[in-house]
Amino acid sequence: AHLINFPGDRTEQILLDFLSQPSGEQAVQIAKRKAVEVLGRLGATQSVPVIGQCLESDDIYLVENSVWALQQLKCCDPAIIGRMLSLLQDKSQNLRVLIQCLAGLKVQESVESIRLLQDSENLGVRGAAISAIAQLLNDKSNLGKIVEHLTVPNQMDRQSAVQDLIDANASDFLPAIVSAPVSPAFRMRACRQILNDSDSMLIDANILSLIDTVLCDDPSDIDIVHKYDQQPSVEFLLQDLFSTDFSRCYLALMSLRQCSSEVLWPLMSDLWEREAHNDYGAHYFFMRIFGSRSDWPQDGLRHALEIIQESIINRRPQFRKSRAAAIQALHFLSSDLFINTMPDFLSESVDAPWDCRYMTVMCIENMAEMNLSLKEKILSHFMDDSDVFVRARSEICLSRVRELSA
């Protein structure tokens, strides 16, 4: 796996030589799965024939990774594509990955086989098949069936549904994706990928409102799947913020609104020190809670502001989605501190991601107490931003400010 950090002919040849070695040992088979994946990620097109041979393996996971790699490498070898078409008839294989690959490679010969899988009992296979038909035939009439998968009990099926809509470039269903009970990072990726080819002139207020909704991430905007039979304890709700199922997290976040800040703060403070500070899921939801109310106990508010400021400039990748949430929380709890520290959390030294800059623009726009000329001056700095969505958001904000100034 570390060879991905050393791209080049020598690395690719080492991996190809390794794949050519016959061995039935489990450790070797596992390593071959990774080798195929790395070759795909490296874009090693000369490896296509060797990876194609891996489709004959009895190891279904090696076959799965080989199919994925062949899609990355844009395989057009008729014999290899023919083998993948035949694998569609083998129910022991990962049919979802096969369908995604054949659709991604625009293999028209796969249409009839894939069409039959649109009624599969497996939701992941069914959704991929519907998405593939939309891509191959430009027939989007069945995409609404994938939307139904966005609120099924199993989170993996929900995430698969989002990916299927991304693959089909289903822009009409962006509102449904935005409200799906999956990771906000995944929903945002869907928005950006589907709108990826848009020019800033075409990104209107309606599109930006979807981005705003994901970034603000109010649990009342989420189609929560779960529900409680009776109101759980505060301790239980806080623990649910660690769940790997985002529907449970959003349900807990919504339910915690009924708890007073006096009761909530000591429990949160203790849990933060013990676990939440190092759990990227709970870390994010703690930022949401910090920025959801202004009546924290005085000592709690001071501590929360310290945590928030540290989180804004935390460059560890796993805590990336917390940064914009922390900016919003800081703006809500202390607008003066927000203004005073804004140059620091937007400086090049902390490498502020696009969503942090976007959130800053949103916060500036909402500062009713700020002088309009100062607001216009600050927003103007974002007009040359490298990100198309930040530019579009700042342009809309500026036009609104100038209307008020006129």
Provide a role label for each language-model segment.
Residues 6-22, 44-56, 75-88, 107-119, ...:
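Amphipathic alpha-helical scaffolding segments comprising HEAT/armadillo-like alpha-solenoid repeats
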Residues 23-28, 58-59, 90-94, 121-123, ...:
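Short inter-helical turns and helix N-cap capping residues of alpha-solenoid HEAT/ARM repeat scaffolds
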Residues 1-8, 29-44, 53, 63-75, ...:
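Structural detector for internal amphipathic alpha-helices that build alpha-solenoid repeat scaffolds
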Residues 20-30, 213-216:
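Short, flexible, glycine-rich and Lys/Arg-enriched loop motifs at helix boundaries
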